Design a protein with these regions (language model features):
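A residue-level marker of the well-folded mature domains of exported/periplasmic proteins
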Residues: 2-7, 23-306
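Sec/Tat signal peptide C-region and signal peptidase I cleavage site
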Residues: 17-23
């Protein structure tokens, strides 16, 4: 197989990450992630770079965003990778609809595209005539899992709020659905639900306002750990130790919080392995393997102090 050569490296919002010295026989994989201010994606990048070094048979070029709402950077990255003629694009989309048209153009250019972590919107794919598999976790099931852990502690009638992720991201919608599933199953009362766009400081401000409006809150369901950290900071500032918090992602920052009880639980979706796994899928297709179809599930695990 003759692989296309990469003309230039792709800029990351926090600097320039160029792949290893390129060889004629190495395929070039463009990795498009979300915010590198988020520990989850920092770990993902580290895992992907380690995987590149371990395999040694592909060149990685990785792009991240400055913030979780910096969708234009992702779109520009895809367009840049198309112009550069990479062999594969592996993407965790920040917006499940907005990225479909540029990814369609990539596929039309003969580039293998792997959608991982955050699924693309099914309606948008149908509208654009795109058939693309998803490699990633059960976000709804994971949120239900951690939500059930909170419900078990609070008991029926427990009063909770939801801190949502980006409205345009399918995994945010799925995690909200999972939280709502847990609320219904556990007989909890939902007092409020609003987005903090995956961001720590925004979650801090949002939850501070929620707590003022609803001082009777007993539990918080945060759609990612970065926002859970913001909630914990708000609770510490308010001097409240009676409110239970759960998150999603199992980033390193929450380990001590789970150990000392500031965070009840989170969901590990093994972010450090996620991009590496998606890259492997892309390389299998490039090597002549079958086209991926449907949903290729990756692992999740409930993480508690026990």
């Amino acid at each position: 197989m003759v692989f296309k050569k990469l003309a230039a490296s792709a800029a990351i919002a926090f600097g320039l990450f160029a792949g290893a010295a390129m060889a004629e026989d190495k395929p070039v994989v463009g990795l498009v992630m979300k915010s590198l201010a988020n520990e989850f994606f920092q770990n993902m990048l580290a895992g992907a770079k380690a995987h590149e070094a371990e395999r040694g048979d592909f060149t990685l070029n990785a792009v991240g965003m400055q913030s979780e709402t910096d969708i234009e950077t992702q779109i520009n990255a895809v367009e840049s990778f198309i112009s550069q003629g990479v062999d594969a694009i592996v993407i965790a989309p920040a917006d499940s609809r907005a990225l479909v048209p540029p990814l369609k153009r990539a596929m039309e250019a003969g580039i293998t595209v792997i959608n991982f972590d955050v699924p693309l919107d099914e309606a948008a794919k149908a509208e654009n005539g795109v058939e693309l598999a998803f490699v990633g976790p059960d976000n709804r099931g994971g949120a239900k899992l951690v939500g059930d852990a909170l419900a078990a502690k609070l008991g029926k009638g427990g009063k909770v709020v939801i801190i949502e992720g980006n409205p345009g991201a399918e995994n945010a919608a799925q995690r909200k659905q999972g939280f709502e599933d847990a609320i219904a199953a556990g007989g909890l009362e939902l007092l409020d639900s609003s987005t903090a766009h995956w961001e720590t400081e925004e979650a801090n401000t949002l939850f501070t306002n929620m707590l003022t409006a609803h001082p009777e809150i007993q539990g918080v369901m945060a759609a990612n750990d970065s926002m859970a950290v913001g909630v914990v900071k708000a609770l510490e500032a308010a001097g409240r130790k009676d409110i239970l918090v759960v998150g999603f992602d199992n980033i390193p920052a929450v380990g001590p919080m789970i150990a000392d009880g500031r965070l009840l639980a989170t969901v590990d979706q093994f972010g450090q392995q996620m991009a590496a796994n998606a890259i492997d899928k892309a390389l299998e297709v490039l090597a002549g393997g079958p086209k991926l179809e449907g949903w290729i599930k990756t692992d999740i695990k409930l993480v508690t102090a026990n």
